[in-house]
Amino acid sequence: EELAKNELTNKVNIVKTGCFGLCAQGPIVIIYPEAVFYHQVQPKHAKKIVSDHLINGKLVEKLLYHDSDTKEIINKLMDTPFYHKQKRVALRNCGRINPEKIEEYFAFDGYQALATVVNEYSRDDVLSLLETSGLRGRGGAGFPTFMKWSFAKASQSDQKYVICNADEGDPGAFMDRSVLEGDPHAIIEAMAIAGYTIGANQGYIYVRAEYPIAVNRLRIAIKQAREKGLLGKNIFGSGFSFDLDLRLGAGAFVCEEETALLESIEGHRGEPRPRPPFPAVKGLFGKPTIVNNVETLANIPQIILKGPEWFASFGTEKSKGTKVFALGGKIQNTGLVEIPMGTTLREIVEDIGGGIPAGKKFKAAQTGGPSG
């Protein structure tokens, strides 16, 4: 309304993005090209932002971020202490692009990894890259991703499946939801790469129905990818075909377990299956299936584009890369953080999280939320 009143609708574009991560200071507005960010913005502030910043080029000081320790004014979001020790790989596009426009994903190398894989790499080449990167499953078990994919590739079958486990059942967890809401095309691209690698032409994203924004943006992203020829027949003229469908879960906690998830997709009660056989050998509808969670998949396009050595340069000797955490509870900076593996819990709580409110002593932290 304020833009219309000041005849700025053709000059200023408002873009809805995914989560920036610093939830404690939200809602956050970033104004480009200066990249000035305002925090805790309310509808009543719109008039001031338009009149002062957009028209007169003057910063709205009361909406600027003040460092709690130094009292310094910080204009750039990534200059705040919250981001100093973070390394955004899985979250790289969250808050940076409009997730409902595939063109903005293209602008940040979107689908280049898929194009490279289907036109230049063999299936074994992709597995070798994943092995060198050291990527392990981010869903909890930490199983090497290349090994899971290798088992499925080696399984002989007329049909194979790729599944994204987006059934984030732990109370207080919103890591996967934020990626789906902020960067859905990254998951689609990664699943297509997985399909090429194991020889699958069909994938399913299993997401709980309680995530309406994520579901809507995934539907939009899948439709856009099909329209651009990035899902469907003969992708990039390579002869490789792959398509995706959504399956909505009813919110059962047990369906976060991969075999219970398979049962749910098949239309049965979500109950875990005895193993072996493992899904990579006998999974969805009795066919070889790989199940990866959202965060695991979000890393894959970057590993292809920047190289496995780049990814392996973060983290520890046995745990490469980064890990996303939902930071909540009695802490200054609640939100979403992505840090290199090996970062200590104290660094997360005190350096990134800003410590305990009112200067109180840090006594305990529980990882994994109420479910442990």
Region spans (language model):
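Iron-sulfur (Fe-S) cluster-binding segments and ferredoxin-like electron-carrier domains
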Residues: E1-K5, A24-N56, P144-S155
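Short amphipathic, charge-patterned alpha-helical segments
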Residues: E1-L3, A190-A194, G342-A358
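Immediate flanking context of iron-sulfur cluster ligation sites
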Residues: E2-F20, H53-N56, D125-L135, G354-A364
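Local cysteine-cluster metal-coordination motifs and their immediate loop/turn environment
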Residues: V12-P33, G134-P144, F253, K363-S371
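Fe-S ferredoxin-like electron-transfer domains
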Residues: A35-T132, L231, S264, G270-F285
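Hydrophobic alpha-helical positions that pack around
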Residues: K85-Q86, V215-M341, I352-G353
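Conserved phosphate/anionic-ligand binding catalytic regions in large, soluble enzymes, centered on
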Residues: L130-A152, G251-E263, G267-R269
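Histidine-anchored nucleotide/phosphate-binding helix
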Residues: D183-T197
